[in-house]
A protein has these predicted regions:
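One-carbon transfer enzymes
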Residues: 1-215
């Protein structure tokens, strides 16, 4: 309901693994997550042992909450992105509540996860300017863009023997999918934001490329 009807934005288009330099020939293990007690998932034992014992670091994407001994098997653990400042905005959807609350910035966190929700060590954290973002989708795009450089920075930090990652000082409120009046707020802000975005594009000064004088 919150995704807004329309085509999938370009920043969410999937990229086939075989098209990515450096990992096209990587081994792939297809598996079904094993439900953990309470909440979250485990990796199947055989996959956990094979990957964990032969990997320097794992990056979790689209696997839900991952728990269990596997988190400590890779040399540098398991990393996960959180689109939000863990001391202010936890839960989901990332960036949505910052949009509804008219925040000027939104956080992005790369964390080494453990069994406690959102309590793992922070490897890299950053914030993006969203003061002029007219829709949640625009906030989401900016947060995802920030993740690219953060992953490279995080790997470099993990390779640095002098770097010490630390857990968050405190954890903020846990947000969930909005309902009731919050959905109406979202619809209203999105409608207004789209209109403002169109006017901003129309009023933007036209830029022209000029030839620099030769020396």
């Amino acid at each position: 309901m919150l995704r807004q009807f329309g085509p999938t934005p370009e920043y969410q288009w999937p990229t086939p693994i075989e098209d990515i330099d450096g990992v096209a020939d990587a081994d792939r293990f297809h598996c079904e997550p094993v439900p953990a007690a309470g909440f979250g998932n485990h990796l199947p034992t055989d996959v956990a042992e094979t990957v964990g014992e032969n990997t320097d670091v794992v990056v979790r994407f689209g696997f839900g909450v991952l728990k269990g001994e596997f988190l400590e098997m890779p040399t540098h653990g398991v990393l996960s992105f959180h689109r939000g400042d863990l001391e202010s905005y936890r839960g989901q959807p990332g960036g949505l509540w910052e949009f509804l609350n008219d925040e000027p910035t939104a956080g992005v966190t790369l964390q080494r996860i453990d069994d406690d929700l959102d309590a793992g060590e922070i490897v890299v954290e950053d914030e993006v300017d969203i003061a002029d973002a007219h829709t949640w989708r625009e906030i989401e795009r900016r947060q995802i863009e920030a993740c690219v450089e953060m992953l490279a920075a995080g790997i470099e930090r993990l390779r640095d023997p002098d770097h010490e990652s630390t857990p968050p000082d405190s954890l903020g409120s846990l947000y969930t999918i909005p309902s009731g009046t919050d959905v109406l707020r979202y619809v209203g802000k999105t409608a207004v934001g789209r209109v403002r975005s169109r006017y901003a594009e129309r009023d933007a000064p036209e830029t022209r490329r000029t030839r620099q004088p030769s020396e």
